Curated annotation (Swiss-Prot):
One Pfam family, short name: tRNA_U5-meth_tr
GO biological process: tRNA methylation
Family the entry assigns: Belongs to the class I-like SAM-binding methyltransferase superfamily. RNA M5U methyltransferase family. TrmA subfamily.
EC number(s) per entry: 2.1.1.-, 2.1.1.35
Catalytic activity: uridine(54) in tRNA + S-adenosyl-L-methionine = 5-methyluridine(54) in tRNA + S-adenosyl-L-homocysteine + H(+); uridine(341) in tmRNA + S-adenosyl-L-methionine = 5-methyluridine(341) in tmRNA + S-adenosyl-L-homocysteine + H(+)
Recorded GO MF terms: rRNA binding; tRNA (uracil(54)-C5)-methyltransferase activity, S-adenosyl methionine-dependent; tRNA binding
Organism: Vibrio campbellii (strain ATCC BAA-1116)
Protein's name in the database: tRNA/tmRNA (uracil-C(5))-methyltransferase
Keyword Repressor: no
Cited function: Dual-specificity methyltransferase that catalyzes the formation of 5-methyluridine at position 54 (m5U54) in all tRNAs, and that of position 341 (m5U341) in tmRNA (transfer-mRNA).
Length: 369
């Protein structure tokens, strides 16, 4: 795709193409009827990044055509949230005539929320000084006086200045219950807030009749762990990225959930620990006895590369497997192994990325009789 063509008239057509493609891809696995979860037709992305172009006294956002690499001016971006679109012109207008804020500015990143908070990161090809800090504080005050709930980060080489927080607090509604999530700049969060809510509701529905405990690999900031905790006695969740683990702990406390335990381990390390091949000090320090857990269900949301063979083999040891995938190609590869022992009993498409080829899929697998 050369440029993102956000055309609501085409939304249903592009969704139908994805439905057909996903059904064709997974037909060999005897999947049930596909459950389809639509996105808003525009203003669905909670984050966006733009390069900044300096032209005389003018200053504006640009993006690049992916095929020709030619730049084009962006004043509004229909894929991004209304909050980002509302802020874009006011931010650039406020910086245009301010030498300290605009000098060697080359990129602006926005992280917004359904809750109304927004975080702006300004990236520079120069070191930032006291003058920049004073001007950035004034910019923040000016924009918040106009009704925004905004924080600013200034970034340069080996430098990060935070005014006043480097995160936003998101609130996602799951079947009428609100969950609080800390989302930190530069760490992974679901890009499409409304579809993220639908994914959580689907996962909760799939595990409604569960017994025992839940094991979750690749838990990020606890996005799924918190919503799923209601369906299980206990949740044991693993994540390798330290900032995500810190956010997950924050989110557990903020939501007053007392049956979720987060461990900083990779999926591969957890496999070694559960099979008794290796001991981890982190488990002892956290006071976690893996043998005390009775996990019948495992939840995985791996990176685009999917799960390695050893992790797939370990996952096969559970009665029920819930798998969220941002790359159906690697989901297929993993199902070649998982379907030796399990049947797919639920199958879903989440349109996280409208007007692109990307598809987010979910499957529930249950052990063959």
């Amino acid at each position: 795709m050369a440029t993102l063509d956000v055309n609501p008239q085409r939304y249903q057509e592009q969704l139908a193409e994805k439905v057909e493609r996903l059904n064709d891809m997974f037909a060999p696995y005897n999947v049930p009827e596909l459950e389809v979860f639509e996105s808003p037709e525009q203003h669905y992305r909670m984050r966006a990044e733009f390069r900044v172009w300096h032209e005389g006294e003018d200053l504006y956002y640009i993006m690049f055509n992916q095929e020709t690499r030619e730049k084009y001016r962006v004043d509004q971006f229909p894929a991004a949230s209304r909050l980002i679109n509302d802020l874009m012109p006011l931010l650039v207008e406020a910086m245009k005539d301010n030498e300290s804020l605009r000098r060697k500015l080359f990129q602006v990143d926005f992280l917004s929320t359904l809750s109304g908070e927004i975080l702006v990161s300004l990236l520079y090809h120069r070191q930032l000084d006291e003058e920049w800090i004073e001007n950035a504080k004034a910019l923040k005050q000016r924009l918040n006086d106009e009704g925004f709930n905004l924080n600013i980060i200034g970034r340069a080489r080996k430098m990060k200045i935070v005014l006043d927080r480097d995160y936003v607090i998101e609130k996602l509604d799951v079947n009428g219950q609100s969950y609080i999530y800390q989302q930190v700049e530069n760490s992974f969060t679901q890009p499409n807030g409304k579809v993220a809510e639908k994914m959580l509701e689907w996962a909760v529905d799939c595990t409604q009749e569960s017994t025992g405990d839940l094991l979750e690999l690749y838990c990020g900031n606890g996005n799924f762990s918190l919503a799923l905790a209601q369906n299980f006695d206990r949740v044991l969740a693993t994540e390798l990225a330290k900032p995500s683990v810190v956010s997950a702990q924050y989110n557990i406390a903020a939501n007053e959930i007392d049956n979720v335990q987060i461990l900083r381990l990779s999926a591969e390390e957890f496999t070694q620990a559960i099979e008794g091949k290796r001991e981890f000090r982190r488990l002892q320090d956290a006071g976690v006895d893996l043998k005390s857990y009775n996990c019948n269900t495992i939840f995985v949301d791996p990176p685009r590369s999917g799960m390695d063979v050893d992790t797939c083999k370990m996952v096969q040891g559970y009665e029920r497997i819930m798998y969220i995938s941002c790359n159906p190609e690697t989901l297929k590869e993993n199902l070649d192994i998982l379907c030796e022992t399990h049947n797919v009993t639920r199958f879903a498409l989440f349109d996280q990325f409208p007007y692109t080829h990307h598809m987010e899929a979910g499957v529930l697998l249950e052990r063959k009789a």
